[in-house]
Structures are given as C-alpha cells and as structure tokens.
C-alpha cells in the first residue's frame, strides 16, 4: 500500500536539493566523474547559448527575424545530427569512446569562433557546427548515465543527473550575463574553457571505465 502524503513528505519531495542529498546512496568515483562531465557540458553550453543571440545582434546588427531564422536552421541541423551521428554511435555501442571526442569538437569550434567574430559567414557556419555537436553530446551523456544506473537506485541516479544539468544551466546563465557585460566575447571564452574541462573529465571517465584486458578476453 502506498504511504499517505504528509506535510513532511511533500516538503521532502518538493525540495530541489533532495537529489543531491540522496546521492550518497549510489555515488561512486565513476559517477562523480560522469556527473562532473554532465554539469560542465550544460554549464558551458548555457553560457554560450545565452550570449549568442545578443552577440550576433550587437556585433552584426542582425534583426530579430534574422536571429529567428538562424536559430531555425541550427535547430534543423541539430535534429539531423541527432538522427544520424548520434543514433549511429548509440547503435554501435561506442558511446563511452565517442562522447569525449564529441565534446572536444564542441570545444574546438568555440575557440574557432573567437577568431571569426568579425566575419559573419564563417562565424555562423562554425556556430552551426558547434550546435550540431552539442546536440549529439546530450543524448550520449544521458545514455551513459542511464546505462550506469542500476536497480532500485536508477530513479535517484536519473534525478541527480537532471539536477546537475539544472545546476549547470543556472550557473551558466548567471555567469554569461556578468561576463557579457564586461566583454562581448568573454562568455565564449568561459564556455570554451568549461567545455575543455568537460572533455578532459570525459577522457578520464573513458579510461577508468574501460574494461580490463582480462575481462575483455572473456
């Protein structure tokens, strides 16, 4: 029989930090590394995306309609990338080996943008590539977390995953606003550094999660 709802139960369930407090039930070193990657990925992406529209409007003088058209193209290409590249990686079972390289591609495109901020067409093309790779990274990371979650703790694990994404988004939005006020490109620099850290942690996770030679032979 289900337990009756009480005030304490409602307060506990509504607590946005409940997922963090419950993480001690399942947290391991590998989980900590993986969740660091997911938090950094969302932090970097949010910081970048928050300032992208303002940047192309302020620096290139694009209208709102033009900005909307650009976002539409980016959304379509991201959808195609998810339906092709992402699904191919998942079907082949190479998610752990691929996600670090996908994040590396995101990082490289962001740093490339810093050298193209005065050239409209190359700037937009590289941004489309960034958004496409970022769109691929999200379901790959979610797949990694879902496969790592086991048994009765699976709901807690996925709840913690969503909490880390939300935390990254909140910090990314706040940081992007402060940095953009200081300099138009600073949020891009910050996003690039954060995604570089996400890439490094992804490689660490890949190495630590790799099967041992003995288990691979079996």
Spans of model-derived segments:
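Helix-to-loop junctions at the C-terminal end of transmembrane segments
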Residues: 81-95, 180
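C-terminal transmembrane helical hairpin of 12-TM major facilitator-type secondary transporters
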Residues: 96-141
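Short amphipathic helix-loop junctions that connect adjacent transmembrane helices
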Residues: 50-67
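A membrane-interface helix-boundary motif in multi-pass transporters
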Residues: 178-196
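A late C-terminal transmembrane helix in Major Facilitator Superfamily
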Residues: 151-181
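Juxtamembrane intracellular "pre-TM" segments in multi-pass secondary transporters
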Residues: 1-34
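Multi-pass alpha-helical transporter architecture, strongest
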Residues: 191-218
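Intracellular helix-loop hinge segments at the cytoplasmic ends of transmembrane helices
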Residues: 54, 139-148
